[in-house]
């Protein structure tokens, strides 16, 4: 009986049945323990005959705490590695007596265990211990911490200890706790980046909302006491007279990067500010109270995380509880200005160079002096890259399509009335589709009418599959001087404009071996001009022309034969000789010459000439009436084919 410290009736927490509890001190009869019997009578009988109904070894207990829940207001909870025990007293005074007695017995047990042969004590005593069920949410899921744990609150730490485990599974510093709260029977803790688990939340379920509220209040008190302890340490003695400027914790439209925030914060701290207001400390219940999900998201966005070596909570507690004076002002962000070779800087400006690979300055004839200096400076910078556009070029994506506007080198004129030839083609293998071709004004000066004469009819005119669709009528081209003609006299070749020389090969015509050449007409509308004057051709022959002005006089290979020639064919010559001597009013396209088939039959030169026709009529056998019919036939041919056609370089019947 000498080892009994205290005895009396208490109720068990779960069953709420009264039991007779006996608190024994460590000694020769056993270690410090808490025994309970069914009643006092059984205890007296068991003193000599039997043992207690239950025993709790206090040397294995790592927490003894006062609690209260919805049903029992005066609880004592003792936690061990394997389990625990909770008892309820009748009043607060009785609760305090048992609590103090258990702590004294534990202190005696620690004193005895300090001897070398004594067993090791399970570790430092915790201020508070709660049995919780960590839910698979947040860090409980990502760190695989779900299950039954003991949440142990020490002086500076908060640990999670599994059942039948000697060491805590996770130990969180109170300085790393950003906030905590409870909702119904759930209690959550949010930690920052400095925690061993990383940033996130831990959600724990307890018996009821009263226990959750008790956990909330107890941990907040520990955090508050810890923040008060850290308060004098956050201010250095050298800066005691200089208040620390704290930026406003409001939302910024464009938050700067962390590096710029740090630079601006140091620059403000170096400047002394007088009469700076000191923010009032905020209450703990306001910042760490339970909020709705919408309010929590707003609170998360409004908080500013500071990168201090102490911890996330240390910095947050300084801001929350006003541990250091500060000035609430709008931060001024000053980005650093590194040297030319200090960092690998990539400029994203609008006007800059496009790539690191640049041509030598000597090869760029069109580069201005300012740009040349920029290129020279750029070659000295190894790690510098400009991602913008070229500086001299300030186009907005607009391409002028008018004939008289200034054109760049890669501009292609699309108007048939443009007489000035474009710039020379610089890309190999490129075929200009413009009717004005690619003749360079620097290489060849064009005049109207041209000095070069090109004959119609080409032997290799069928080597190209290109068809000219541009009409040379007066309504679609600039009108040359009327006194000049494109087609020569009967003995000379046909003249073509000098702009034709810039066309692809399919527009050039080589001279025919025959002495006389004729130009065909494929225009749908034949216009009349002043009689007695030479006339320019109304269209170009469908047959191809030779290329002469493309770079390198490039000749395209023969066409595989996609082109299909559609032309009018005249009746056989035998039918014409046997039948009437009248020349049919048909024109056949052949090598760029228009022939009257009947006249071709009467005379071999293929021309409906008056003197030749008259000679053939004289040589014709028959009476004078037949010769008159032959002469009449020539006049009808003249009227049928039209004066425009017979006047375009062909000798008509006169």
Curated annotation (Swiss-Prot):
GO MF annotations in UniProt: insulin receptor binding; insulin-like growth factor receptor binding; phosphatidylinositol 3-kinase binding; SH2 domain binding
PROSITE patterns: IRS_PTB, PH_DOMAIN
One Pfam family per UniProt: IRS
Region span, Disordered: 228-329, 473-494, 507-532
Phosphotyrosine carried by residues: 36, 345, 398, 411, 430, 563
TM stretches of this protein: none
Extent of Low complexity compositional bias: 514-524
Sequence motif YXXM motif 3, location on chain: 398-401
Modified residues (Phosphoserine): 276
Motif YXXM motif 5 location, chain numbering: 430-433
Ranges spanned by the short sequence motif YXXM motif 2, renumbered to the chain: 384-387
All residue ranges annotated as the IRS-type PTB domain in the record: 126-230
Domain PH: 3-107
Keywords: Phosphoprotein, Repeat, Transducer
The keyword Phosphoprotein belongs to this UniProt entry's keyword annotation: yes
Taxonomy, superkingdom: Eukaryota
Positions of short motif YXXM motif 4: 411-414
Motif YXXM motif 1 boundaries: 345-348
Record has Ribosomal protein as a keyword: no
Biased composition (Polar residues): 235-245, 307-321
GO BP terms, alphabetized: insulin receptor signaling pathway; insulin-like growth factor receptor signaling pathway
CC annotations in GO: cytoplasm; intracellular membrane-bounded organelle; nucleus
Quaternary data: Interacts with the NPXY motif of tyrosine-phosphorylated igf1r and insr via the PTB domain. Binds to phosphatidylinositol 3-kinase p85 subunit via the phosphorylated YXXM motifs.
PANTHER family assigned to the protein according to its UniProt record, in alphabetical order: INSULIN RECEPTOR SUBSTRATE, INSULIN RECEPTOR SUBSTRATE 1
Function, in words: May mediate the control of various cellular processes by insulin. When phosphorylated by the insulin receptor binds specifically to various cellular proteins containing SH2 domains such as phosphatidylinositol 3-kinase p85 subunit or grb2. Activates phosphatidylinositol 3-kinase when bound to the regulatory p85 subunit.
Official protein name in the record: Insulin receptor substrate 1
Protein source organism: Xenopus tropicalis
């Amino acid at each position: 009986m000498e080892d009994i410290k205290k005895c009396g009736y208490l109720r068990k927490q779960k069953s709420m049945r009264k039991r007779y509890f006996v608190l024994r001190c460590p000694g020769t009869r056993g270690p410090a323990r808490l025994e309970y019997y069914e009643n006092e009578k059984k205890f007296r009988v068991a003193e000599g005959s039997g043992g207690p109904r239950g025993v709790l070894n206090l040397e294995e207990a790592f927490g003894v705490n006062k609690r209260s829940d919805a049903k029992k207001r005066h609880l004592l909870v003792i936690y061990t590695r394997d389990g625990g025990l909770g008892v309820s007293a009748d009043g607060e005074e009785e609760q305090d007596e048992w609590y103090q007695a258990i702590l004294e017995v534990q202190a005696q047990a620690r004193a005895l265990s300090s001897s070398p042969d004594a067993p090791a004590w399970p570790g430092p005593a915790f201020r508070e211990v709660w049995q919780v069920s960590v839910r698979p949410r947040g860090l409980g899921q990502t760190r695989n911490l779900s299950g039954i744990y003991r949440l142990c609150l020490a002086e500076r730490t908060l640990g999670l200890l599994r059942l039948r485990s000697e060491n805590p599974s996770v130990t969180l510093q109170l300085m790393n706790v950003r906030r905590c709260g409870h909702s119904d029977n759930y209690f959550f803790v949010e930690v920052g980046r400095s925690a061993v688990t990383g940033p996130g939340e831990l959600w724990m379920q307890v018996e009821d909302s009263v226990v959750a509220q008790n956990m909330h209040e107890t941990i907040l008190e520990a955090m508050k006491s810890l923040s008060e302890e850290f308060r004098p340490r956050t201010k250095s003695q050298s800066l005691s007279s200089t208040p620390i400027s704290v930026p406003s914790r409001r939302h910024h439209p464009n938050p700067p990067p962390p590096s710029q925030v740090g630079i601006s914060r140091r620059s403000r701290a170096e400047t002394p500010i007088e009469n700076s207001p000191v923010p009032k400390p905020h209450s703990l219940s306001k910042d760490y109270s339970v909020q709705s999900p919408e309010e929590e998201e707003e609170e998360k966005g409004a908080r500013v995380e500071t990168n201090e070596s102490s911890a996330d909570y240390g910095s947050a507690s300084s801001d929350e509880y006003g541990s250091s004076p500060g000035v609430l002002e709008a931060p001024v962000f000053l980005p650093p200005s590194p040297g030319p070779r200090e960092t690998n800087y990539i400029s994203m400006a609008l006007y800059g160079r496009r790539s690191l690979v640049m041509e030598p300055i000597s090869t760029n004839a069109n580069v201005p002096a300012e740009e040349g200096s920029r290129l020279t400076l750029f070659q000295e910078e190894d790690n510098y890259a400009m991602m913008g556009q070229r500086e001299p070029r300030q186009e907005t994506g607009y391409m002028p399509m008018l004939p008289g506007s200034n054109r760049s080198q890669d501009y292609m004129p699309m108007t048939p009335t443009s007489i000035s030839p474009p710039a020379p083609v610089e890309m190999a293998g490129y075929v200009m589709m413009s009717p004005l071709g690619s003749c360079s004004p620097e290489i060849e000066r064009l005049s109207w009418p041209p000095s070069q004469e090109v004959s119609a009819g080409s032997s290799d005119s069928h080597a190209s599959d290109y068809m000219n669709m541009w009409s040379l009528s007066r309504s679609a081209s600039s009108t040359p001087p009327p006194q000049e003609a494109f087609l020569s006299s009967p003995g000379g070749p046909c003249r073509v404009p000098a702009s034709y020389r810039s066309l692809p090969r399919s527009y050039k015509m080589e001279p025919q071996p025959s002495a006389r050449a004729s130009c065909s007409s494929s225009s749908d509308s034949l216009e009349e001009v002043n009689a007695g004057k030479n006339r320019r051709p109304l269209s170009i022959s469908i047959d191809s022309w030779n290329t002469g002005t493309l770079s390198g006089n490039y000749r395209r290979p023969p066409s595989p034969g996609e082109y299909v020639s559609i032309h009018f064919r005249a009746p056989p010559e035998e039918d014409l000789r046997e039948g009437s001597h009248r020349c049919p009013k048909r024109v056949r396209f052949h090598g760029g010459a228009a022939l009257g088939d009947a006249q071709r039959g009467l005379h071999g030169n293929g021309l409906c000439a008056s003197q030749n026709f008259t000679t053939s009529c004289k040589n014709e056998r028959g009476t004078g009436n037949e010769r008159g019919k032959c002469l009449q036939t020539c006049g009808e041919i003249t009227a049928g084919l039209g004066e425009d056609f017979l006047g375009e370089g062909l000798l008509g019947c006169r």
